[in-house]
Amino acid sequence: MTTSEYGSRRSDDDQWDIVSGVGYTALLVAGWRALDTVGPQPLAPDEYAKYFIAASGDAYLNDQLAHPPTSVDETAFPRLYGVQTRFFDDFFRSAAAGTKQAVIVAAGLDSRAYRLEWPSGTTVFEIDLAQVLEFKARVLQRHGVEPKARRNAVAADLRTDWPATLHAAGFEPGQPSAWSVEGLLPYLTADAQDALFARIDDLCAPGSRIATGALGSRLDHDQLVALEQTHPGVNLFGDVNFSALTYDDKTNPAQWLAARGWVVEPVRNTLELEAGYGMTPPAVDVRLDAIMHSEYIVATKP
């Protein structure tokens, strides 16, 4: 891997596929889900993640899967992404009881339409660039994996008029819906974050719910490299500097939603989620959260 290919600065109209730019983050996270799945105590097993890594041909991630890390430091990122995956899995399991519409924003290689048990009649709308959605569907079809809900791929760039594309895919704004915005916000400017939430708010009927969050609301590559000195093997980013793909200006999602009348549950970080899942966060997880500032939010529109 090289920083020139994956760590280039963003532009307002940049594009990507599954092995470049922002798209590579989806592949990397899928790799960590696959690693957590083969670990001793996976919180949210994803048996399909390994298919994406194999199909990508990415040498680094395929080597990781062939020789899975074992130490508490080396498994930190897979473990923490397992925690994040469990959070959003639980959100959809809970929200599905009150809606037949689930929307996964910037779906990437999210396999919840295929992994989770959805109530009969549920439609899962996956929003992302066409080439990303096509890669996912093609790989899973090759392995005979079928979605467990009606899956509607919504090929759209979030910087364009994606609500119109969502409407065209059959979304009904007059009915309650459940939305996930997972790991996306660091890759958007504050203005883009505001626009995203405003559009979601406009599309949500009363009773709708949203979950948003990321392992890192900020990512300082230099601090991560420095952490390697005391926690060897923790930096599974290799030489890729993903902080070059993120923006420093941020919106506070909890405040934004509350100001518009949404009922926001207490904001939690990774360490609090781990404790809630019966885990004792090891020292490396505490250090990582201090660097990355995780936050996870659930809100309901009354």
Curated annotation (Swiss-Prot):
Assigned keywords, A-Z: Methyltransferase, S-adenosyl-L-methionine, Transferase
Any GO MF annotation of the entry: methyltransferase activity
InterPro entries, A to Z: Ppm1/Ppm2/Tcmp, SAM-dependent_MTases_sf, SAM_mthyl_Trfase_ML2640-like
PANTHER family named in the record: S-ADENOSYL-L-METHIONINE-DEPENDENT METHYLTRANSFERASE YKTD-RELATED, S-ADENOSYL-L-METHIONINE-DEPENDENT METHYLTRANSFERASES SUPERFAMILY PROTEIN
Positions that bind S-adenosyl-L-methionine: D128, D157, L158
Domain of life: Bacteria
Gene Ontology BP annotations: methylation
EC number: 2.1.1.-
Protein task: Exhibits S-adenosyl-L-methionine-dependent methyltransferase activity.
Similarity comment text for this entry: Belongs to the UPF0677 family.
S-S pairs: none
Presence of the UniProt keyword Methyltransferase in the record: yes
Short name of any one Pfam family annotated for the protein: LCM
Transmembrane segments: none
Enzyme class: transferase
Protein known as: Putative S-adenosyl-L-methionine-dependent methyltransferase MUL_2961
